[in-house]
């Protein structure tokens, strides 16, 4: 795997609905064996105390817009091959809250950079159960960003 100190090929600036502190950056780095996806998210809803950290569904969606407040314009999960959830091309591991922040790095071979340009990245309010069809019962969309070439 290449070092991601190189510039990403694509990025998505994540924002919550107006007035929400949710923000972040998702970056996409081409690799020999797939795409390295990194996420740095801030302002997630969180609770303090033991066993209280939240888990959030995190996916690439097929739509090309992030219209607040519900981000329904992002469409459904991005899926190149007609697979069922959790095998959609856009199904990614969840984000784990740490005091309102989350960081993620994952290598995937489910898509190439050209496949996702103009698509959206969505953060959901609940964890993905990786079973319920068609989208994992991850709840409302609380953050969204459009993937653009960098």
Would you name each region that the model predicts?
Residues 1-150:
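N-terminal leader/targeting pre-sequences
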